[in-house]
Amino acid sequence: MWDYLGNIKVLAAAFVLVGIAVAQQVTVSGQVEVAAPPRHSHLPADAVVWLTPPEGAPPIQVTDVPEQHPSLTQKDKSFSPHLLVVQVGTLVDFPNHDPFFHNVFSLFEGKRFDLGLYEAGTTRRVRFDRPGVCYIFCNIHPEMSAVVIVLDTPFYGISNRRGLIDIKGVPAGRYVVHVWDERSLPEDLAQLRREVAISPSQTSLGKLRIRETDVTLAHKNKYGQDYEKPAPPGPGYIPQ
């Protein structure tokens, strides 16, 4: 015989547990501090911090990939925004808003691709289907660069100009903290990785001290070669 009261109690307990789980989602905060060479001091903006399960724990299911595609726009021989953070599976648009051709490519771990030449007013797309850091360039214009960070977690934040970071909707539990900064060496960033316990009473990551470097490396074109130097300007017209 169906136990009506018993099932009501089970359902009530389930709703209570769901309510507790939702209530235990918190906003995790932190602050980035930058140590840079004296001549190259930078604002602590655009550092990326994200949380993943510790080793041996089940992975986070990425389910809320946006229906609208984020864009990395090409305009005035630059990418906008310079930094884009997406979850695995996201389709990113690369519209060309310049009155000339571009050739967007990446040869790095997050996604290797070459969109080829495409003209003004057209758009090409890339689905980023694996986690990693993608450095994006144009094969025609060496001054163009951008970064797409692809994460297998929805729990991430980007520091503002004051270095403040908020990561919203994080369930209570244990996580590994990861940090990325464009001007920092990978080995320095690896030292910031640590495991933390997040709970309603413990939501702060504290201060994340990032050491930046003034080393900049010139990148190659998509063939692994140096870019061709632009031709010198021709002689000006002198009216007779």
Place the predicted regions along the sequence by residue.
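Extracytoplasmic copper-binding redox domains, predominantly the cupredoxin/blue-copper superfamily
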Residues: 24-240
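Bacterial N-terminal signal peptides
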Residues: 7-21
